[in-house]
Amino acid sequence: RDSRISGPAISGWALEGFGAEGALCTNFALASTPAMFMCTVMGAQPFDGAVMVTASHLPYNRNGLKFFTSAGGLEGSDIKAILAQAQLITPQAAPQAQQVQQQDFMSVYAAHLASLIRDGVKAKDYLHPLAGLHIVVDAGNGAGGFFAEKVLAPLGADISGSRYLAPDGIFPNHIPNPEDAAAMASIRQAVLEEKADLGIIFDTDVDRAGAVLPDGEELNRNRLI
């Protein structure tokens, strides 16, 4: 789930429902959408499926579900097919509910991202390829704070001046949306004030990002491409 205030309740209901049908469920708590997909393809025993509770960049009082398997995310047509199939299922006695497990998958995922960066940069200081770079992150109080604290910092980057890394489900500072003018103005201000080498801003569930260059040039939407 992302940081929305309704996230714990909705994810709890989803886990309860899956568990009641005999599924072995694991609660990742605060997570990103890309991480939820990656849990279906990473590790010795990938998960059969994953559900992300998020409404992406929409206001804090919205929420929804994103479904993933190792084949990717379910689209609207997939959801319609599932709902149609559900109408044909004859209710049966549910098996004994399974206990929900807890896992800090975001630390595993962050280590995976850091490893990819180390292998890609191939710096002389393999463990700290970003040493000497000042990179500020604006997570908008969504789920993206981990990227600064668990990816960039261990790689040697200076993340001082990063903003709104702590999750807050009412988004008190700005909408976590790299397409929003106020959000981009926030990360641009951070880059210029800190004289940073790069600024990165994420949406709430961290599947979209924007960037700001040292001179304040914004790279988001089509400009990012």
Enumerate the predicted regions with their spans:
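N-terminal small/polar loop signature for handling phosphorylated ligands or for N-terminal nucleophile
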Residues: D2-R62, K150-V212
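Short beta-strands and strand-loop turn motifs
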Residues: R1, A93-A97, G210
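Glycine-rich phosphate-binding loop of actin/hexokinase-like ATP-binding domains
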Residues: V51, F67-I82, V206-I225
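Catalytic-loop motifs flanking and including active-site residues across diverse enzymes
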Residues: I10, S32, G144, R221-I225
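Gly/Ser/Thr-enriched, mixed-charge loops and adjacent short helices
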Residues: A44, N61-E194
